[in-house]
Curated annotation (Swiss-Prot):
Family: Belongs to the JARID1 histone demethylase family.
Protein name: Lysine-specific demethylase 5B
Residues at which Fe cation binds: 499, 501, 587
Polar residues compositional bias, start-end: 1376-1387
Binding-site residues, 2-oxoglutarate: 425, 507, 509, 517
Length: 1544
């Protein structure tokens, strides 16, 4: 990169960047408006700009963000685009800074011409601002006045120095030595003895150019430029600039500027210029201008005789030759002490006399402008340079530098003279030459189908200036500078200065890509204000450049403008955003970094009046016009038939003004004497050939020319400025006559007339007063007329549509408000509905309705609604002012509010108060019923209360509720701990806690559980006491239920351990009973073994069916169903006393006996059936009979020896029972009686105990009957029949098969006693293919009584000696004597009588016992006789030879027992014959039972032992029911045990 274009950021400045500038840290101006149009709005750019114009005009600039999907492709060829940027030194841009630099340049030039070296002094470690010092001294009256009045301290204070440090004297010395000689020179005091030179003489041949920055428009790129750099901040040293001898004056001036940290002035011979910069250390001397200390410079004498030629021009003397100075400009001589002010020493450099110095310093400076860089860039190379510069300057990546930091640093740099930062700006690159960034037709960039839409987009800057709505489209002259876009490639700090667009037109700028561009804008109405402020603050700049602000070379800090009340706005334009500037809106800005932008001018119809005003302004400034405004108007008027009616109307108005002005000017010219005229086609001339010589205005309508100056023209405003010839020699050149202009204007008028009439009607309708307003229908008619006549969619029509739409919306809203319907009573979230108005908005809406340009029918109705809403507000306010309003009243008022579709401010508070009132009522209601007030209810109420707005009543209720909850939770937790306490608490302590809990007005779950536990404990104790006090033996289930209940009660119960022990004893007793009775792995339960069988045969089912058919006798309760063990167990459990249990078991015994008898007969019959009956099913397997088989002694069914276990031959013959019939071990009675005794000691009733008692009673009863049978003669008769071969077996056994079938030592089915050895030998066998290993006593071989006795013997689960004795007696062989006796005819009769007598004795004994009982119970003699009569026929039934006879006998016996039971049932205590004394004796008698229950009252029933002791026992103590006591003999346990050995 060449040195001329290299950018040197220099040392990094310290941050924050407040800088030493006059304004301190930069404060950003307010933001300008930012618009984000919808797609519909974005479709027409001119319509959108017209829409936003009222807003954006107030700020001068605005930003437009296109819709997000609008992203035009970048159409520039990046590789082929190249440009030469402009060089910008930032501190030369700012107006006030440039004034300072110019002043310092003049001071430097003055001292340079005086041959002295200039040092910039430092005061208080700060560089002295010579410009400010000079200005302040001048404001105070000058050097002499300040010294006289001693104002140096005041001046030092104004310059920012601290007072009291003798700074004033230092400043005075610096001023006196540096500035005072210069001011004396300017005032002319140094030339008072000389004739002042004419400063206005032409000195072009010696012209001095201190800046060498020609105007921007005429600068040519130089081959080389001095390297730009950032000067270091001057800290504590002054800069001493030495001028080398070989350097020219211009070079020294250049170096002087560089040493002062100022922009370097350029010289004409800059190509060979070299700069030498040196910083010298601080010198403590106060003086600033230092003369040469070496050999004083004097005029060297060329010849000895020429000395007299040099004399002082002031004093005329040639003396003091060594003090005589020779001017290097004019060779005049002066004494150093004759000069004003005098010089102490001879300068070391070239010296100019006051005359030459005045001539040099009076030369005007050339206009300031930008110079072009020497290097040509492409986008790529410029971007690399720009990014490197910004990254190095801020020492961070470019994208991380905040825009605020860049902005503050920019304004600091442009305001300081100490730092020289130079940047480059690729500005004003013609898109015509390099292509636009937007796609264009026939462009080099190929577009996708989606991107082709951008070719015709109105926002494509190539299209916007030439669109139909743009006025510039009608200009045929070549104004490509305004109609074609310009490209701008920026870098960090590159800027564009304050300016307005040509002809005060609009401009639009689009940032294609890159970093943001910061804009500042001033609205058009403040343009002259900005100009005046800048002229006031920097008047020196406008002396040489009156049109400075049109040159785009001057910038001023926005804060400075805002301080002088100039409105300034800013924005950051990001990539993809537009910035629009409005007519006459000054704007400036800078780039944040490398970016690419494109801009173009355009003019809308509303600009036309401003455009004419701008031309007049240009005429005053003598500024060139880009095009002729009048020519444009006439061009548009010439094609009035195709103009838009709005454009035609506007052009017609502007043309009328033009014609009037032209008519007046031509009349003025005519009065001056100009009479010659000629038509001239001005549009055919180049613009520079038809410009007014005076004001530079482009002439079109007319001009004045003179033959003395051919080719020169003046406008009619400056006729007198053409030449000195008399006016009659002038010639008026015109384009149109007035007669030509009027038809053109009328054509425009005709084109716009219908529209104007319509527009007039629209304006009248829009601006009508209240009493003259039209209806909404009239507005719609105007819109329909515009559509029918195809008027343009201009601002007026859009405004009419907008007003109509607003009116329609207002009508719709008004109707909705009048309907007064809300969708919901309460909206979620509590927020304001978007469709609802507040009362204030309603009031404003009503006001808006009255302010509408049209009249709505809903307006008066809505006014009435507003009145009703205001009444509601008054009532609601009154209700809300009450301390405790009722919920009902609040709800009623809220219901009224639902009629209004208005957001009422009171509703929120009313709903809050309603919630509070409802909550308070809910709390009050909950507290009225403490039993239903749970902890969760209290917590819920508290949670609801917490969510309520603060209110005193709520807070009080909350406090009470919280206190109640705290107490309740405390006691509930305490109750819970009491319930879970181990060991458990006593009933008294828990009852005390319950009393405390009952005082709490709330429902406590654990408290309720504690209360329930206490109540359950009391009930339990009451039940236990009742059980103990009743005198009854407790039932096991009752005890278990009590124990279970007691264990579940969390209270310490004293009786519970005793009951648990009792239940444990019962369980132990049951375990002992199980071990005694049940076999190993028995499928039967203990109760099932002890109770009579309920699962025998099918008799149960038959009896059930028969009972269903038999009606119950009147007055009798239905008997308990005993068809299964569960029925029997339930009946035993439900029985309240032992007697009823025994009766139940007795009934079960009868069922068992009957069912088994039927089963035995059926099985016997099955075995006696014909052989060909193949349906016979036997055995456990229920298959057909097959030898070998064995027959069960009890059920008489046959079983295959392969299916069951049978005894071996070695074991002898034993009674065999099948698995169904053998249910227990059948322990001997001696093992059972201790169980009964221990059960009586336990004194607990349980089904198994009742069953055991009944089984023992049944066993003892069977023993008694068996003993009677054995002692009677009836058994002999049976024995004879058995022995005589009446007993037979159908099947014959095979000994070998039996022995091989079973080898078990003791099969489960065998009994514990043996049969006679000759049992099989005495049996007659029939030949049959079936045979059994054992034969049973045939049923028809014995009497029914014996058969029943034998059957019941096997049913008994007890081993008795009488059973074996009975079988041995029946199956023993008769002796010969017995056989002889049996053959005797008399013996049998005798034996029979004996037998009958024995039997009769037994019966008499029973009758005596029965009679004794009946007498004791007071039975009448008649009833006893009836009983005796019923029992007497038994004598006839002694001989029982058939089962039918046996059944008749049983029925008769049961009838007698039933009579006894009936007599017992009907003998109530009131009918008894006992006296009260006897009753008391019975009650006081002692029961000898081991575990006497000591019953009282109705339970004192007695039974006498029929054994040897004859003692009386309580029936309930020995487990005997009244029925059993009447039907059977009772032998106590002691007699049973005592008599058992004798019976053996």
């Amino acid at each position: 990169m060449e040195a001329a274009t290299t950018l040197h950021p220099g040392p990094r400045p310290a941050l924050p960047l407040g800088g030493p500038g006059p304004l301190g840290e930069f404060l950003p101006p307010p933001e300008c408006p930012v618009f984000e149009p919808s797609w519909e709005e974005f479709a027409d750019p001119f319509a959108f700009i017209h829409k936003i114009r009222p807003i954006a005009e107030q700020t001068g600039i605005c930003k437009v963000r296109p819709p997000p999907d609008w992203q035009p492709p970048f159409a520039c060829d990046v590789d082929k685009l190249h440009f030469t940027p402009r060089i910008q030194r930032l501190n030369e841009l700012e107006a006030q800074t440039r004034v300072k630099l110019n002043f310092l340049d003049q001071i430097a030039k003055y001292w340079e011409l005086q041959g002295s070296t200039l040092k910039i002094p430092h005061v208080e470690r700060k560089i002295l601002d010579l410009f400010q010092l000079n200005k302040l001294v001048a404001e105070e009256g000058g050097f002499a006045v300040v010294c006289k009045d001693r104002k140096w301290t005041k001046i030092a204070t104004k310059m920012g120095f601290a007072p009291g440090k003798a700074v004033g004297s230092h400043i005075r010395g610096h001023y006196e030595r540096i500035l005072n000689p210069y001011n004396l020179f300017l005032s002319g005091d140094s030339l008072r003895c000389l004739q002042k030179p004419n400063l206005t003489t032409d000195t072009k041949d010696k012209e001095y150019k201190p800046h060498d920055i020609p105007q921007r428009q005429s600068v040519q790129p130089s081959e080389t430029c001095p390297p730009a750099r950032r000067a270091k901040r001057m800290r504590a040293e002054a800069m001493n600039i030495k001028i080398e001898p070989e350097e020219t004056t211009e070079a020294r001036t250049h170096n002087l500027r560089r040493r002062m940290g100022c922009p370097t002035p350029k010289c004409e011979n800059e190509k060979e210029m070299k700069s030498s910069i040196k910083q010298e250390p601080i010198e403590r001397k106060d003086y600033i201008v230092e003369n040469e200390k070496e050999k004083p410079k004097s005029r060297s004498k060329k010849a000895t005789n020429a000395v007299d030629l040099y004399v002082c021009l002031l004093c005329g003397s040639g003396n003091d030759e060594d003090r005589l100075l020779l001017c290097d400009g004019c060779d005049d001589s002066y004494h150093t002490f004759c000069l004003i002010p005098p010089l102490h020493d001879v300068p070391k450099g070239d010296w100019r006399c006051p005359k030459c110095l005045a001539q040099e310093c009076s030369k005007p400076q050339e206009a300031f402008g930008f110079e072009q860089a020497a290097r040509d860039y492409t986008l790529r190379t410029f971007g690399e340079m720009a990014d490197a510069f910004k990254s190095d300057y801020f020492n961070m990546p470019v994208h991380m530098v905040p825009t605020e930091l860049v902005e503050k640093e920019f304004w600091r740099l442009v305001s300081t003279i100490e730092e020289d930062v130079t940047v480059e700006y690729g500005a004003d690159i013609a898109s015509k030459e390099f292509g636009s960034g937007f796609p264009v037709r026939d462009g080099k960039i190929k577009l996708s189908p989606e991107e082709e839409e951008y070719l015709d987009s109105g926002w494509n800057l190539n299209n916007m200036p030439v669109m139909e709505q743009s006025v510039l489209a009608h200009i045929t002259a070549d104004i490509c500078g305004m109609k074609l876009p310009w490209l701008y490639v920026g870098m960090c700090f590159s800027s564009f200065c304050w300016h307005i667009e040509d002809h005060w037109s609009y401009s639009i700028n689009y940032l294609h890509w890159g970093e943001p561009k910061t804009w500042y804008g001033v609205p058009g109405y403040a343009a002259e204000q900005l100009e005046n402020v800048m002229k006031k603050l920097a008047p020196e700049l406008f002396v040489s450049q009156p049109d400075l602000l049109h040159q785009l070379v001057t910038i001023m800090n926005p804060n400075t403008l805002m301080t002088h009340e100039v409105p300034v706005y800013r924005t950051n334009q990001c990539a993809g955003e537009f910035v629009i500037t409005f007519p006459r809106a000054y704007h400036s800005g800078f780039n944040q970094g490398f970016n690419f932008a494109e801009a173009v001018n355009f003019c809308t119809v509303d600009w036309l009046p401003l455009g004419r005003q701008c031309v007049e302004h240009y005429r005053l400034l003598h500024r060139y016009c880009v095009f002729s405004h009048d020519e444009m108007i006439c061009k548009m008027a010439s094609k009035a038939d195709v103009l838009d009616v709005v454009v035609a109307s506007t052009v017609q108005k502007d043309m009328a003004i033009m014609i009037e002005d032209e008519k007046a000017l031509r009349e003025t010219v005519r009065k001056l004497g100009v009479i010659d005229s000629e038509r001239m086609d001005f549009e055919l001339l180049p613009d520079d050939e038809r410009q007014c010589v005076k004001c530079k205005t482009t002439c079109f309508m007319s001009a004045i020319s003179c033959s003395c100056k051919p080719g020169l023209l003046v406008c009619l405003h400056h006729v007198k400025e053409l030449c000195s010839c008399p006016p009659y020699k002038y010639k008026l050149r015109y384009r149109y006559t007035l007669d030509d202009l009027y038809p053109m204007m009328n054509a425009l008028k005709l084109r716009a007339e219908s529209y104007n009439e319509w527009a007039l009607n629209v304006n009248e309708a829009l601006e009508a007063k209240i009493n003259k307003k039209k209806s909404l229908v009239s507005f719609k008619a105007l819109i329909e007329e515009s559509e029918m006549k195809k008027f343009p969619d201009n601002d007026l029509l859009r405004h009419l549509r907008l007003v109509t739409q607003d009116a329609e919306k207002c009508a719709s809203v008004a109707q909705q408000l009048l309907n007064g319907k809300r969708q919901t009573r309460y909206r979620s979230g509590g927020g304001k509905s978007q469709n609802q108005l507040t009362v204030n908005e309603l009031r404003q809406f009503v006001t808006q309705l009255y302010a509408l340009p049209c009249v709505l029918s809903q307006t008066p109705l809505l006014k009435d609604l507003l009145n009703r809403v205001e009444d509601f507000q008054q009532h609601s306010q009154k209700l809300l002012s009450e301390e405790t309003p009722s919920a009902a009243e609040l709800q009623d008022l809220l219901d009224v509010s639902f009629e209004f579709d208005v957001e009422l401010p009171q509703l929120a508070e009313m709903r809050i108060r309603l919630e509070q009132a409802r909550w308070l009522e809910e709390v009050q209601q909950a507290c009225l019923d403490p039993s239903s007030l749970t902890l969760d209810d209290m917590r819920r109420l508290i949670d609801l209360g917490v969510g309520l707005a603060p209110y005193s009543a709520v807070e009080k209720a909350m406090a009470r509720l919280q206190e109640l909850l705290t107490v309740s939770e405390h006691w509930d937790d305490k109750a819970k701990s009491l319930l879970k306490a181990r060991p458990r608490h006593s009933l008294n302590s828990l009852a005390t806690a319950v009393k405390e809990i009952e005082e709490i007005p709330a429902y406590l779950p654990n408290g309720a559980a504690l209360k329930d536990s206490v109540q359950r404990a009391r009930d339990w104790l009451q039940d236990v006491e009742g059980l103990q006090a009743g005198g009854r033996v407790p039932v096991l289930d009752t005890l278990i239920e009590l124990v279970t209940r007691g264990r579940s009660i969390p209270v310490h119960l004293n009786s519970l351990p005793r009951l648990e022990t009792l239940v444990a004893e019962v369980q132990a007793w049951k375990e002992c009973a199980v071990n005694t009775f049940l076999t190993e792995n028995s499928p039967y339960s203990l109760l099932e073994v002890l109770c009579p069988r309920c699962d025998i045969g099918l008799l149960g089912l038959k009896r059930k069916q028969r009972k269903l058919k038999e009606p119950l006798p009147n007055g009798k309760k239905k008997s308990t169903k005993l068809e299964s063990l569960s029925d029997l167990e339930r009946a035993l459990t439900e029985s309240k006393e032992t007697a009823s249990a025994m009766a139940t078991l007795g009934e079960a015994r009868l069922r068992e006996m009957e069912a088994l008898q039927s089963l035995r007969l059926a099985n016997e019959g099955k075995l006696l059936s014909p052989l060909q009956d193949v349906d016979i099913k036997i055995c456990l397997c229920q298959k057909a009979p097959a030898a070998p088989m064995i027959q069960c002694e009890l059920c008489r069914d046959a079983f295959h020896t392969s299916c069951v276990a049978v005894p071996s031959i070695s074991q002898g013959l034993r009674i065999w029972l099948c698995p169904h019939c053998r249910r227990s071990e059948k322990p001997p009675l001696e093992k059972i009686l201790p169980l009964l005794a221990s059960l009586q000691r336990i004194r607990v009733r349980l089904p198994e105990g009742d069953a055991l008692r009944y089984m023992i009673e049944r066993t003892v009863n069977w023993q008694h009957r068996a003993q009677q049978l054995l002692s009677s003669g009836n058994l002999k008769f049976v024995q004879d029949r058995v022995g005589s071969g009446l007993l037979y077996s159908r099947w014959q056994a095979s000994a070998g098969q039996v022995s091989d079938t079973n080898k078990v030592s003791q099969p489960p089915g065998t009994t514990s006693f043996s049969l006679p050895d000759d049992w099989d030998n005495r049996t007659s066998y029939l030949h049959s293919p079936f045979s059994t290993g054992r034969s049973c006593i045939p049923l028809h071989g014995v009497s029914p009584e014996v058969n029943e006795l034998l059957m019941e013997a096997q049913l008994l689960q007890v081993s008795l000696p009488e059973i074996q004795e009975l079988y041995q007696t029946l199956l023993a062989k008769p002796s010969p004597a017995q056989q002889t006796d049996r053959s005797s005819p008399v013996r049998p009769s005798s034996e029979k009588n004996d037998c009958c007598r024995g039997k009769r004795d037994g019966i008499n004994s029973l009758e005596r016992k029965l009679k004794r009982r009946l007498e004791r119970e007071g039975l009448s003699s008649e009833r006893w006789e009836r009983v005796k009569k019923m029992r007497t026929p038994k004598k006839k039934k002694i001989k029982l030879s058939h089962p039918k006879d046996m059944n008749n006998f049983k029925l008769e016996r049961e009838r007698s027992y039933e009579l006894v039971r009936s007599a017992e049932t009907h003998s109530l205590p009131s009918d008894t014959s006992y006296s009260e004394q006897e009753d008391s004796e019975d009650e006081d008698a002692i029961c000898p039972a081991v575990s006497c229950l000591q019953p009282e009252g109705d339970e004192v029933d007695w039974v006498q032992c029929d054994g040897s002791c004859n003692q009386w026992f309580h029936q309930v103590c020995v487990g005997v029911s009244p029925e059993m006591a009447e039907k059977e003999d009772y032998i106590c346990v002691r007699c049973t045990v005592k008599d058992a050995p004798s019976r053996k």
